[in-house]
From Swiss-Prot:
Residues 353-368 have a biased composition (Polar residues). GO terms for cellular component: mismatch repair complex. This is DNA mismatch repair protein MutL. The keyword DNA repair applies. Disulfide bonds: none annotated.
Length: 623
C-alpha cells in the first residue's frame, strides 16, 4: 500500500474519536473554552440528549473576526506559546473546535468586548464557510447540531437521550464546583432547567457552590481541608465518616482548577478513610490540589482527564495525612442525615404499624444497622489470604494483648445479673457531647441524654473502636516484634524492584519485617512480623514491591497489621447481651468522646445516633 497524507477532514475525525466521545465531551470542551475566555456567565442549552443540539453562550472576551477561521483550525490556540510544561489554561491543544466541526454542523459566533458587531463562521463536516457579520451581544456562542452526522457509526454507541442529558449535567456541575464566581445555567427540551448562581470567591463561596451540587447536607457534615507540603497545597472539604455513599459519584478532584479522574488521588482518598467506613461505602469529598504546572503533566490524554505527577508519593502522602488529621480532630459528630432517616422510618411505619414500609436507601437506615457487618479484609490478594489470614495466635503479640485487656478493663462487665435501670447522673455530664447514660436497653444499647438531645449507643461497636484505636497506638508506639526465620527466604524480583524495596528496609523493620538485598535481583527475608503468624512471604514481598513501584510507600504491610488489630478488637470488645452498670456506661461515653474516629466501628457502621429534642417533638406533632 502507498503511504500518503490524510486529508485535513479525516485527521480531524480521527482526533474527534479521542476528544469527542459523547455530547458531554463537547460541552466540557466548550465550557472550558468559555472559562479560559474570562466568562462570568455561561449558559448551556441542549436537545435530544445533545445529539440534536448543543449550544454554549458566554460573556467572555470573544474572538476577533480575523481569528475565527483560525479558531476552527487544528492546533491553533491562544493559550500556549512555546512551553508545554507551563500550562495554566484548561484548554491548550487547539483540537476541540476543529474536531467538533469535523463530525457535526458547527456555528461559531463571537463579538469581542471592544467590537461594534459580531461575526460568525460555519463548519459542516469539516468544510468552512465564512466569516460573515451577525447580530450578537458581546461574548461567544458555539452551536453544535446533528452531532456525529458525518460519522453515523458513532451514534450506535450513544446512550438514551436521558442518559446523555444526565452526563451533560454532571460535567457542568463538576466544572462549576471549581469556579464558584461563574454563573452556570442548563436548559433544553430534554431536561429540567438547572442553575448555579455565582457565589463569589474563597472557601465559604466554594462550600456554598458545593452545596448547590451535592445538597445542603454536605455542608452540614463537611470538614475543611487545608494543608501544604513541599510546594503542593491541598484544600477542599470531606464528609465525616458517617456521611458516606454507596458509590464514588460524589467524589470530585481538581488539579490547578482542572477536573480530573485520577486513580492516585481517589486511591489516597480511599486509604484515608480505610479505618472508618465500610469497604462497600464511599466517602464524599471535594479536593483541590494546587502546584507548580511543571510538577504535573496534564498532557497525558487528549481529553485531559488524567494527569501524571512528578512525585506521586508526595501527593498521596499529603492527601492521606491531611484527611486523617481532619478526621481525628473532628471529634464526636454524627451525620445530620441519621436523625432524618429515623424520622422518615417512623413516619413510614407509623405507630403500631404491623408492616414495615421501605426505609431510605442510605447508610443510616435502621435496617442496615442490624445487618451483620462484613468481615474486615486486608488489601492483599486472595492468594495471600490463604496463608496470612489464619486463626489469631494471641500469644504472638503479648504487648498488644495486654493493651487490649487494659482497654477492656476500663469498661469492665459486671458479674451481677441486675438489670440496668434509669440512672441518676450529675447535671454536668449532660453538657458532654454524648451526655449522661440513663439506661441500657436490650442489653446492647446505651441510652444517654444531653441538654438538647437523646443519644443511643451500640455498646459493642463503640467499644470495638476504642480497643482498635488502643491497639493501633500500641503498634505505632514501639517497633513490632519480629520472628526470625530458621532459613532466610529468597525472593526473586526484577532488579529495579529489588533496589526500591531494599531502600525501604528501615521502614519495614519497624513493622517486624527484616529484608536485605541479596544480589542484583533478589531480596532475602530474615524476619517476619510475629503477630501475622505463618504467611506467604513470597507473595507479601511481591505485593510490597508492586506497591512501592506505584506509590513509593510500603503501607500494605501496615494495613495487614491493622487488619489483625481490628480482628482482635472485634473479638475482645464488650459483646451484645452484656449488662453494664451506669458508671461503666458513662465511662464508655467519655472514652468515645476522647477517641478519634469513635463515630464508626472498625467495619464502618455507626456507633451511635443522636436525636435532637426538636426531632423528637416533631415525631409527636409538637413542631
Amino acid at each position: 500500500m502507498t503511504i500518503r497524507h490524510l486529508s485535513e477532514t479525516i485527521i480531524n475525525q480521527i482526533a474527534a474519536g479521542e476528544v469527542i466521545e459523547r455530547p458531554a465531551s463537547v460541552i466540557k470542551e466548550l465550557v472550558e473554552n468559555a472559562i479560559d475566555a474570562g466568562a462570568t456567565r455561561i449558559e448551556v442549552v441542549t436537545a435530544g440528549g445533545g445529539k440534536t443540539l448543543l449550544r454554549v453562550t458566554d460573556n467572555g472576551s470573544g474572538i476577533p473576526a480575523d481569528e475565527l477561521a483560525l479558531a476552527v483550525s487544528r492546533h491553533c490556540t491562544s493559550k500556549l506559546t512555546d512551553d508545554v510544561h507551563d500550562i495554566r489554561a484548561l484548554g491548550f491543544r487547539g483540537e476541540a473546535l476543529p474536531s467538533i466541526g469535523s463530525v457535526s454542523k458547527l456555528t461559531l459566533k463571537s463579538r469581542p468586548q471592544d467590537a461594534d458587531s459580531g461575526f460568525e463562521v460555519c463548519v459542516t463536516g469539516g468544510h468552512l464557510d465564512g466569516p460573515r457579520p451577525t447580530a450578537l451581544n458581546r461574548g461567544t456562542i458555539v452551536e453544535v447540531r446533528d452531532l456525529f452526522y458525518a460519522t453515523p457509526a458513532r451514534l450506535k454507541f450513544m446512550k438514551t437521550d436521558r442518559a446523555e442529558a444526565t452526563a451533560i449535567t454532571d460535567v457542568v456541575k463538576r466544572i462549576g464546583i471549581a469556579f464558584p464566581h461563574i454563573r452556570f445555567s442548563l436548559a433544553g427540551t430534554d431536561r429540567t432547567p438547572f442553575e448555579m448562581p455565582a457565589t463569589g470567591t474563597g472557601a465559604e463561596a466554594t462550600l456554598e457552590r458545593i452545596g448547590q451540587v451535592l445538597g445542603r447536607e454536605f455542608g452540614e457534615n463537611a470538614l475543611a481541608i487545608d494543608a501544604e507540603r513541599d510546594g503542593v497545597r491541598l484544600a477542599g472539604f470531606v464528609g465525616i465518616p458517617s456521611f458516606n455513599r454507596g458509590n464514588a459519584l460524589h467524589q470530585f478532584a481538581y488539579v490547578n482548577g482542572r477536573p480530573v479522574r485520577d486513580k492516585q488521588i481517589f486511591g489516597a482518598l480511599r486509604g484515608a478513610y480505610s479505618d472508618v467506613i465500610a469497604r462497600d461505602r464511599h466517602p464524599v469529598a471535594v479536593l483541590f490540589l494546587t502546584l507548580d504546572p511543571a510538577l504535573v503533566d496534564v498532557n497525558v490524554h487528549p481529553a485531559k482527564a488524567d494527569v501524571r505527577f512528578r512525585d506521586p508519593g508526595l501527593v498521596r502522602g499529603l492527601i492521606v495525612g491531611a484527611i486523617k488529621q481532619a478526621l481525628a480532630q473532628s471529634g464526636i459528630r454524627p451525620a445530620t442525615s441519621g436523625a432524618e432517616a429515623m424520622l422518615q422510618a417512623f413516619r413510614a411505619e407509623g405507630f403500631g404499624a404491623q408492616q414495615s414500609a421501605p426505609r431510605p436507601a442510605n447508610s443510616y437506615s435502621p435496617a442496615s444497622w442490624r445487618t451483620a457487618p462484613p468481615a474486615p479484609r486486608s488489601e492483599w490478594s486472595p492468594q495471600t489470604a490463604q496463608t496470612a489470614h489464619r486463626p489469631l495466635d494471641l500469644q504472638a503479640a503479648p504487648a498488644l494483648r495486654e493493651n487490649g485487656q487494659a482497654v477492656l478493663g476500663d469498661v469492665a462487665v459486671p458479674a451481677s445479673d441486675a438489670r440496668a435501670s434509669v440512672a441518676e447522673a450529675p447535671v454536668e455530664l449532660m453538657q458532654k457531647p454524648l451526655g449522661a447514660a440513663r439506661a441500657q436497653i436490650h442489653e446492647n444499647y446505651i441510652v444517654a441524654q444531653t441538654e438538647d438531645s437523646l443519644v443511643i449507643v451500640d455498646q459493642h461497636a463503640a467499644h470495638e473502636r476504642l480497643v482498635y484505636e488502643a491497639l493501633k497506638n500500641a503498634l505505632h508506639a514501639r517497633p513490632i516484634a519480629g520472628q526470625m526465620l530458621l532459613i532466610p527466604e529468597i525472593v526473586d524480583l526484577p532488579e529495579e524492584d529489588a533496589q526500591r524495596l531494599a531502600g525501604h528496609a528501615e521502614t519495614l523493620a519497624r513493622f517486624g519485617l527484616g529484608v536485605e538485598q541479596f544480589g542484583p535481583g533478589a531480596i532475602a527475608v530474615r524476619e517476619t512480623p510475629a503477630m501475622l503468624g505463618e504467611m506467604n512471604v513470597q507473595q507479601l514481598i511481591r505485593d510490597l514491591a508492586d506497591e512501592i513501584a506505584e506509590h513509593d510507600t510500603a503501607d500494605g504491610l501496615k494495613a495487614m497489621l491493622h487488619h489483625v488489630a481490628a480482628t482482635m478488637a472485634c473479638h475482645g470488645s464488650v459483646r451484645s447481651g452484656r449488662r453494664l452498670k451506669p458508671e461503666e456506661m458513662n465511662a464508655l461515653l467519655r472514652d468515645m468522646e476522647a477517641t478519634p474516629g469513635s463515630g464508626t466501628c472498625n467495619h464502618g457502621r455507626p456507633t451511635y445516633i443522636e436525636l435532637k429534642l426538636t426531632d423528637i417533638e416533631r415525631l409527636f406533632g409538637r413542631r
